[in-house]
């Protein structure tokens, strides 16, 4: 519900997600609950989790995951739903679901391979291993690794840098990238043209271009 409200709030330019305290970014799924449900009930549970991650992924504002601790299972899937991931040097990430008898169910099998590639995704999912922040950065799972003490400051700094740009330009870029990710090149280029055109109908584009031209003439 919060993200649905944010999606309609034009005053919010960037969203930062982080966990409370220093221990975990997100605890992920409720394993005790999962141990008691039927196969049919598990489908609904997985669909609910996928709806949550899809809602985060599709919100119009750019999203930054400030991964402050453990991001395992559903927590890692939530982080992967964000556009940018900044991890504390103490963070640990992974998809350990196979250790309890199931594959990732909240989008992990699909988003992980799109972020780090199929081979590395298979390794992480099949082994269920937990990796440190530095390795996560090395394979492209997170964008940056920073000291825990400066995590929020660094996330805010990036958010401010994004927010200083054209809101429409950034949001249309997000649409083009997200929709083009699974398309062939020609379709993706068509999506880019649509995003480009949409920005040309917005007054902010004219104001920014005029200001740039006037500044260049001085």
For the regions a language model picked out, list residue spans one by one.
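A short acidic, glycine-rich active-site loop
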Residues: 36-47
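Well-ordered beta-strand positions
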Residues: 84, 123, 127-129, 135, ...
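C-terminal long alpha-helix characteristic of the crotonase
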Residues: 1-5, 86-91, 142-190, 203, ...
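A structural preference for short, pocket-lining loop segments at secondary-structure junctions
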Residues: 1-37, 55-65, 84, 88-92, ...
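CoA-thioester-processing core
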Residues: 52-58, 66, 72-126, 139, ...
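Short, active-site-adjacent cap segments at secondary-structure transitions
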Residues: 22-26, 71-73, 177
